[in-house]
Amino acid sequence: MMHKHEAKIIWERKDQPFVDNKYSRAHLWEFDGVKVPASSSPAVLPVPLSSADAIDPEEALVAATSSCHMLFFLAIAAKQGFIVDHYNDQAYGVM
């Protein structure tokens, strides 16, 4: 069964220069009406071209993978009759 997943990505140039490649990469992700500040990673583009307080795509990929792993683990544990009271994963990715 296929499911449709949607995300809205919002970025505005405002009064920033653009053609010199010195524009902010800060933008918003919107899921189900919730807006999440996002940006390129400061490790890739330094502040002020990126926002250190925002989630970057690399972090989101690591978090999504970890979240999927947790949900899969919890489903298997429940189906096998195990009780899980707590789950904590300090996920990291190297890219």
Q: Which residues fall in each region the model found?
A:
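Extended beta-strand/beta-hairpin segments
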Residues: M1-A63, L74-M95
